[in-house]
Amino acid sequence: MTGKLRFEVNDNQGCFIFPETWFGSLLDEFEELIDAYDADEISETSYINKLRRLARQENDFIDVHAHLAYVFLEQNAPRKALNAALKGLAVGNRLIPEGFSGRIIWIHPDNRPFLRALYAAILANAHLRRHQDAIMLIEKILDYNPEDNHGARWLLGPELLRTGAHEQARHILQ
């Protein structure tokens, strides 16, 4: 196995493959950091700084970017959240073959960071009132993961209304 994040396609289903080198210290440190933050053992500032350090250490670690995006959303800093989410999405999109129209489903744990980053980008765009961008990303996440583990479909109707697409929104909301 290579030391780089990969994306494989089988039967029109895509799956990210974490490198073996990530298992152990890097993932352990990341999980311990999340646990410490969730337990209020470290400050938000410390959490952000440590996530940024991990991102510098391994830029392809999509989940670090996704978690940064979510903490910025919690701080009501949607522009920072969008930038963090887009960094994670750029990593994943770079690996997804051009023209890929298959699924990237939640059931595969290695796909979850990409889907989390995608959902964070949706939320950030909605907060920034970039409704067309939010709609495009909602449609993309629903194409990739029709099970919609994040509940993105519930944002589609309101975002369509905000763009003036009333008929389309009515159809979605019924």
Regions found by a protein language model. Give the residues of each.
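Canonical tetratricopeptide repeat
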Residues: 65, 118, 152-153, 160
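Short, structured loop/turn "capping" segments at alpha-beta junctions
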Residues: 132-135, 148-151, 166-170
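N-terminal alpha-helical interaction modules that lie
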Residues: 1-104, 112, 118-121, 125-147
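Long, repeat-rich segments with strong aromatic
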Residues: 154-163, 167-174
